[in-house]
Amino acid sequence: MLFEAHPEIDIHEMSPLALAFAGDAVLELLVRQRLVETSRLQPGRLHSVATHYVSAHAQNQELALIEPMLTEEEQNILRRGKNASKASVAKHATAQEYRASTGFECLLGWLHLMGRDDRIEELFETIWKNYTPEQEVTVRRNTSCNKAGAQQTAPAFCVAAQ
């Protein structure tokens, strides 16, 4: 585990937006680590691909993949995060996407602070295996990257060199 849980902190009393703040960092680290491990892209391209995984739009779709897997307690945390969203929204997101992404980040932050990195990894694996980001770079669902210049970025993803 990268960081240790802090049982002395009552996580259930924390602000959902504070949990989302932590969850945002958790997701960013997971995505960046996985991209570095599974691709040979240049740093600028890594950043471009990573931003598509962590956008509010993407998080809304990622949440749809894992929502059926959530326990009742996790669903309650997710709901708290969705309901805590600020009135303002991100530039490139709808209000619904922004609320969902805040709830998703709240859940990740809560799981992390509870020391449930095993659960985070389980949920992230489902996302990584099943989510295709919509991005400006060409991404094709494909099990092999046999096109000239294409590099594998994740299981079943190829990003064509530009």
Predicted regions, residues:
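Double-stranded RNA-binding/processing signature
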Residues: 1-162
